[in-house]
């Protein structure tokens, strides 16, 4: 079997036939970390290292595992030396998804079919840089070539959304770039919580005297995002918690923290529970899809964190007790308050996949006719792999309805990451193809092909009500 040919990752005849239904579908990338300013300015990339390795902690993590010095990863080594160091790493990375993604990016974006190795690294480095300049490769070109119709960025609640506004006014660019409301700093354990309170007060003209003042100010920002085309929120929790508190307790806690008090574990849980519930009520009011990423233990290597900051490849998947108990309480609390928005839950630890899918199935009832009102999101981060994707789809198929799944997202900082949609589609087609080959479903290529197309694109469009 040939590596990275037209049948890459398509493991059976049924998969190859199903893939014809999805291979030319556009991309609806509803969650990523691209910078809207870069999209608007649309500068031509001059060096492949900036485009391919810069900010990519997946690659940095691999390079450290291969004994590469930090100088050649995030330091001041030359661009060529960094590229060679990555090539030296990549040729030993069989089995890691970065190996597959990189090969697909080289072939499908740049037309380079050779396997990148240390021996040919300099030649390919020069060819890639020549390609960038001759073809004027820029963010918008990469987006257009990948047929991306929608991009959901990740944005601070106090962002001016200046660059989203400029993109919306630019009629020469057809892709919609919408902000996503990401209020990490609204949670009391965040190191910048006090600073966020001050800036929120300045932005809204509201004093943060009581809990209700804080929520009112947050609504002002949510309304502003809605006015600027926002369709979703996002949050990242280390753990899913549920710990009820009286409003008087929250008022007292807010006052103490403003005076420099460090909250204890119980108070952190109480604040998270209360704030998230209030935000969900607002998200429902404003029609935001609520995305919940959970289970990441971040910044574990303290020296690298102090030197380089966050998102540099030193994070892990976590575990927790009472996950389903807390999830059920949290979701039921929202139901009781008529505050349950459409939600996508992304679980980082695959050992919880069945439990999460099973819990979400308890709360699908809605009078709006929404299919899978609560979504079990695609394999995230360390689960964004072949086995991770299959594990997530298995759990969803067994506990819910895979046919209603909103499918893949890049969750990436790289303009080359759209190849991950194709990677997912190939794995999806093999997964569905195995059902056909093993006689688990009827050999109905029209029905299964329609299902694959829905998962690849149309379900997300409908779920986010993209027009």
Swiss-Prot record:
Keywords associated with the record:
Isomerase
User: Which residues pair up as cystines?
Assistant: none
Reaction(s) the record says it catalyses: D-glucuronate = D-fructuronate; aldehydo-D-galacturonate = keto-D-tagaturonate
The EC number on file is 5.3.1.12
Please name the top-level EC class of this enzyme: isomerase
InterPro entries linked: Metal_Hydrolase, Uronate_isomerase
The record's GO molecular-function terms, alphabetically, read: glucuronate isomerase activity
One GO biological process term: D-glucuronate catabolic process
Key word Isomerase present: yes
Annotated Gene3D superfamilies? Metal-dependent hydrolases, uronate isomerase, domain 2, chain A
Q: In which pathway does it act?
A: Carbohydrate metabolism; pentose and glucuronate interconversion
Per the record, the similarity remark reads: Belongs to the metallo-dependent hydrolases superfamily. Uronate isomerase family.
In Swiss-Prot or TrEMBL terms, this protein is called: Uronate isomerase
Native organism is: Streptococcus uberis (strain ATCC BAA-854 / 0140J)
